[in-house]
């Protein structure tokens, strides 16, 4: 199921763009992803109410993730590589939902309390 979603030429090409730049700075892919979410995405982590839910399989992994959250923005060449990689793979990137998503409730009411 996941092989069909992610094992695509564009995905591997994107990784070949990202990995050398990440390695040049001594970063891990996980650290790069977390720091991008905190500092370079549209999320408002520091001055807003957005958050990131992480899953871990060990205490060591939790410590590493929390440490990475506290680090600053990524070097510009890493951000540039991520942007370039996204341009390569976005046309074939899978949708988050594997099946069609149908809400069984009024989403506007749930999100905004029915205000106009």
Predicted feature descriptions by range:
Residues 4-71:
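Conserved short secondary-structure transition element at the edge of the structured enzyme core
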Residues 59-62, 66-98:
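Extended hydrophobic/aromatic segments used for targeting, binding, or gating
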């Amino acid at each position: 199921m996941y092989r069909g979603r992610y094992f695509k030429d564009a995905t591997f090409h994107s990784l070949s763009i990202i990995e050398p730049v990440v390695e040049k700075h001594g970063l891990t892919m996980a650290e790069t992803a977390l720091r991008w979410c905190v500092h370079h995405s549209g999320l408002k982590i520091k001055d807003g109410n957005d958050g990131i839910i992480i899953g871990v399989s060990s205490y060591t992994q939790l410590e590493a993730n929390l440490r990475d959250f506290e680090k600053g923005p990524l070097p510009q060449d890493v951000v540039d590589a991520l942007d370039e990689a996204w341009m390569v793979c976005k046309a074939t990137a899978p949708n988050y939902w594997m099946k069609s998503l149908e809400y069984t409730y009024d989403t506007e009411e749930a999100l905004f309390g029915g205000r106009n």
